[in-house]
Amino acid sequence: MTRPVTGKDLMIVNMGPHHPSMHGVLRLIVTLDGEDVVDCEPILGYLHRGMEKIAENRAIIQYLPYVTRWDYLATMFTEAITVNGPEQLGNIQVPKRASYIRVIMLELSRIASHLLWLGPFMADIGAQTPFFYIFREREFVYDLFEAATGMRMMHNFFRIGGIAADLPYGWIDKCLDFCDYFLTEVVEYQKLITRNPIFLERVEGVGIIGGEEAINWGLSGPMLRASGIPWDLRKVDRYESYDEFEWEIQWQKQGDSLARYLVRLSEMTESIKIIQQALEGLPGGPYENLESRGFDRKRNPEWNDFEYRFISKKPSPTFELSKQELYVRVEAPKGELGIFLIGDQSGFPWRWKIRPPGFINLQILPELVKRMKLADIMTILGSIDIIMGEVDR
């Protein structure tokens, strides 16, 4: 007996929140017509921890360890955005040496983030071999972090007015050696991955985003630059000391998953160029603005006294945030990371609104996967590069 055909039989499939390709606790409710994707609904919030509300009950120096749990693979950027806001509100000048060290750490963190994106992205589309090579280089970056900050991840290194401690002896030479080594490894990645016909078959023409569409969706970072828009906040806002270095914005016109891969691969090379220039031109002087540590402005402490010799061990003071509104942003590996800060003449922020790049970039996923194949969901989601810690906050 044959069953009468009354219409298309659509299948609803849950992907996640424990799927290995979900890059965290993301859940997708996918409607399928055979292998074709009809609809896709992302379900968020599994990693929500109330980060914005916590900020309203903490001083900035108390809140710094929390912010490293947003994007826990690029923690230097969350620390930078957290100290940049109060620095601008209080008009605190950062010493040149501290600014250069910040740039070095930010670019090393960008490389580590892109490497940790590239390895699982290749594994998602079936290429297991590059994963191990990529994680080898990532370990070298984490060794540099551990030598400078004491932590491989969650560094808690940035401070209002500077950084927690100066670079240790021999660290600069070790970092320069890594830069020379890593440039040769990027060439190996290009030979192993970029020219691979199977890889090109999986990513070329998949998940295409036009330039105008990317702007309308509010995309940023490699998602925007891969769609033909050369927009980089390091050039636009010129924060820290980025305008003192020579480097180029990396962008592509195609707007597909391959273009996003190429942008991130090229960005790692540009980051190495910035790091090399910063290390070679690293100025002397203090690594923090000591006056920003003054609790009582009327008292002029003797910074050369014995009790101030180990100043990096001392806790920073609680700053009074003036009654102003301020939006601060940095170019994180995943896009524009920003905070909207409202002060209220107290040590705690009245409002701390986070603008996570991953959350906004993820919004276009249902639009990209419609009319694609089920296997393309992994390729497109991987090319977006999300971390659920910052998406859910």
From Swiss-Prot:
Q: Which UniProt keywords are listed?
A: Chloroplast, Membrane, NAD, NADP, Plastid, Plastoquinone, Quinone, Thylakoid, Translocase, Transport
Reaction equation(s) it catalyzes: a plastoquinone + NADH + (n+1) H(+)(in) = a plastoquinol + NAD(+) + n H(+)(out); a plastoquinone + NADPH + (n+1) H(+)(in) = a plastoquinol + NADP(+) + n H(+)(out)
Q: InterPro entries under this entry?
A: NADH_Q_OxRdtase_suD (IPR001135), NADH_UbQ_OxRdtase_49kDa_CS (IPR014029), NDH1_su_D/H (IPR022885), NiFe-Hase_large (IPR029014)
GO CC annotations, alphabetized: chloroplast thylakoid membrane
Looking at the record's lineage, which domain of life comes first?
A: Eukaryota
Q: Write down the membrane topology.
A: Peripheral membrane protein
Record's subcellular location: Plastid, Chloroplast thylakoid membrane
Q: What is this protein called?
A: NAD(P)H-quinone oxidoreductase subunit H, chloroplastic
UniProt organism field: Lobularia maritima
